[in-house]
């Protein structure tokens, strides 16, 4: 089964100083993974945000590119209409969109978030 990685998984898997790096790194071993525009852009946004990691944009792009190459990650388009999302509250809009996108591609959404209620979600523990 292939997994679409959400932003939190990308952050934990790429930044070695992230507290969940060991967990993400171990979970990724031998798995088929995918990203999409939302997860990649979210990774770059959080990585470079002054109140988050405050990393350099070029370095963040380079690390993301190296991660994608190492894991032979598939890039899938975010091709579901946003207005058809099943989200009912603002805090679930992106999470549910990613779960529905993963499901539409026959994948699971890999995340650390336990609050996403969708059949396509696989929580990394």
For each predicted feature, which ranges?
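Short, well-structured N-terminal submotif of metal-dependent ribonuclease cores
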Residues: 1-35, 50-58, 62
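Histidine- and aromatic-rich ligand-binding microenvironments
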Residues: 6, 36, 91-92, 113, ...
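Active-site phosphate/pyrophosphate-handling residues
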Residues: 8, 42, 96-97, 115
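Residues that scaffold the ATP/ADP-binding catalytic core of kinase and kinase-like folds
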Residues: 12-14, 46, 119
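Alpha-helix C-terminal capping segments
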Residues: 24-31, 102, 115-118
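Short, conserved active-site loops that position catalytic residues or coordinate cofactors/metal ions
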Residues: 36-47
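Active-site neighborhoods of divalent-metal-dependent phosphate/nucleic-acid chemistry enzymes
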Residues: 70-114
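Active-site regions of enzymes building and remodeling cell-envelope glycoconjugates
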Residues: 119-125
């Amino acid at each position: 089964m292939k997994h679409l990685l959400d932003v939190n998984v990308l952050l934990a898997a790429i930044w070695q100083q992230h507290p969940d790096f060991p967990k993400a790194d171990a979970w990724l071993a031998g798995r088929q993974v995918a990203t999409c525009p939302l997860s990649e852009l979210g990774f770059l946004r959080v990585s470079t945000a002054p109140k988050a990691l405050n990393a350099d944009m070029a370095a963040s792009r380079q690390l993301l590119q190296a991660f994608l190459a190492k894991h032979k990650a598939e890039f899938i388009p975010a091709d579901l209409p946003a207005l058809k999302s099943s989200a009912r509250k603002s805090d679930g809009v992106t999470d549910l969109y990613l779960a529905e996108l993963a499901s539409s591609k026959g994948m699971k959404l890999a995340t650390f978030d336990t609050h996403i209620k969708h059949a396509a979600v696989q929580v990394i523990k």
